[in-house]
Design a protein with these regions (language model features):
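Domain-level detector for secreted/extracellular nuclease and nuclease-toxin modules, and
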Residues: 1-237
């Protein structure tokens, strides 16, 4: 196991902002929280807080991908990906968790990966991850929620039938209470040279596509203010 029970509170994916789980399988690690979907053999969402002090560039040795001991049904074996032509795409990026060996290693649970086209993973998806780090440097603490859109009839890989999402989402939030600002991105799982702004959508739209209520513990007024429209002007691209 890569997790240390003693540090689980360091996760601080503020519990008041955690999404709903459509599966009831919420798993807390030391530095991120996820909701696992057994039928799709991956997380429907991964949520974590990114702080400026997390933004280090320490060299870390990549560990092996291992099954998540906290997922009751066991997460998929990494060998499902072998020979599939798809990358083991991190949801919580290893690059956001270089500040400690444990935090870094924890991103190598197979509950934190999803089959991604290599050009997408190394291309526009990587650009978005880098932009999130840029925003953290500029604005301070961010809450990040990310996952594939898990639908019926997706292509599957491996003996355990790991689903291959056709699109991915990422929600980034900063600020507290009435000062909160959030962006939602929804992008097809293929490389694109388009600017990231082209993939901005209201968070409401991501909720419709996924069936997830992203800020379920917040008031309806707060949710409709944050989720109903795109407010890209509040963020520097």
């Amino acid at each position: 196991t890569y997790s240390d029970p003693a540090t689980s509170k360091a996760n601080v994916a503020a519990s008041g902002f955690l999404p709903s789980s459509t599966t009831g399988e919420i798993v807390e690690h030391s530095y991120y929280t996820l909701s696992y979907s057994e039928p799709h053999e991956q997380a429907e969402w991964v949520a974590y807080t990114l702080k400026q002090e997390h933004l280090t560039y320490d060299d870390r040795e990549r560990p092996y991908f291992i099954e998540d001991p906290k997922v009751s049904t066991k997460s998929a074996d990494w060998r499902n990906y072998r020979g599939s032509g798809y990358d083991r795409g991190h949801l919580c990026p290893a690059g956001d968790r270089r500040f400690s060996e444990q935090a870094y290693n924890e991103t190598f649970y197979t509950s934190n990966i999803s089959p991604q086209d290599r050009d997408f993973n190394a291309g526009i998806w990587n650009r978005l991850e880098q932009k999130v780090r840029y925003w953290c440097k500029k604005y301070g603490d961010l809450m990040v929620i990310t996952g594939g859109v898990l639908e019926n009839d997706l292509l599957e890989i491996g003996d355990e039938h790991v689903d291959v999402p056709k699109s991915y989402y990422k929600i980034v939030m900063r600020g507290k209470a009435k000062e909160a600002r959030a962006l939602g991105f929804l992008m097809p799982a293929k490389e694109s040279q388009q600017p990231l702004e082209q993939f901005l959508v209201p968070i409401d739209e991501i909720e419709k596509r996924t069936g997830i209520d992203f800020f379920e513990k917040q008031s309806q007024d707060w949710q409709s203010n944050i989720e109903s429209e795109v407010k890209g002007r509040d963020w520097k691209f």
